[in-house]
């Protein structure tokens, strides 16, 4: 969340996609879909028309990507199955969602624990900069618990016709032609606690892999490996007077003590705070970095009690392969987590929905078989819309997270109100209006100046350490 601030100073002008979905809603408004909305696709296809049945699609994984995909498929007339291993899963996720996600995915306000309107970016030398000064009165960053958000999206998919299966996906048999079914093997639990479950199979026409960084669907299509970060998070119940401080405030800490290539965070939840960090390059030291994050925030969380400890891998870039035949990857399984900020919830849900829309469109609301060309439309649209964001944040991480002096420069630039305005336009709405050319030029000069000072400081520090 924090490092998206730098999108603006490298000239990134991410525009909202101008492509219109190839469907129309049969009732109510497209801008705010109700829970049981149905839509139809206008298309023509040469692929086989299905006889006496609908297209069958399985979504593996019930997080934001899987829930959004299953709901969209079910609304579009697809026979939809969603397989999720752990219905109460709690991921070590900061839980920040942009304002646009609340409206775009019609999320009820009661699943949002906190509306963050104040943010602090804290440098290695503990210089704190307020980075939410340009937020308008109605604007905020939502803080959610993943177990609450995920369960809500799965339930909404079920309400719209998806069959939600409590099961552990094991493997799939891949057909040799373009029309035979994929045979999925899984252990079904039927709400049982413990045990290995009952071995079952399911035949489907297409598969969406939304099963996270350790995706078995990705392995089944030989999607390749990627670098990943380890995220470590502790949920800490703190005294009421301390919790009042974090009521609408989030903190991000940068420094090689909390992470050599990421940041530490303190994010407010319903009645506790989430304190965490992550790293790609020094995974074995993650507990040391977590301890340092707690130490940096110690006065503000004093008297707190750890109520839950969570750890999970987070992808650092998209997989080499995200599609094969009638199988596509979305969310963390595809590698859709941004560098610097670690943002993934919105992009997971968005990719799940976009992939499902491509299937609904290609199948004419479940009436025809789909093929790889249909699913590839999702990838083409995704890459066109979001690829620049990932590339820019990759560069920014390499520039500003490489040393403590560079991190000091980063925090210094976050104090600029123009940076903050462009940041939150981009983060909250996933679109940025054209900037002010004079302000852009001034910002570029200030950025260069900050980096020059950072490099000079690093050289002096290196001399002292010899």
Predicted regions and their residues:
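N-terminal chloroplast transit peptides
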Residues: 1-38
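C-terminal helical "tail/cap" subdomain of flavin- and related membrane-associated enzymes
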Residues: 26-30, 360-466
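Beta1/beta-strand and adjacent pyrophosphate-binding region of the FAD-binding site
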Residues: 45-65, 81
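Predominantly flavin-linked oxidoreductase catalytic cores and closely associated redox partners
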Residues: 51-52, 76, 155-306, 315-321, ...
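Glycine-rich FAD pyrophosphate-binding loop
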Residues: 58-62, 71-93
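A conserved beta-strand/loop capping segment in the N-terminal third of enzymes
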Residues: 96-162, 166-167, 172-187
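Flavin-binding catalytic cores
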Residues: 280-311, 320-321, 328, 353, ...
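FAD-binding beta-loop-beta segment adjacent to the flavin cofactor pocket
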Residues: 312-335, 339, 387-392, 398-408, ...
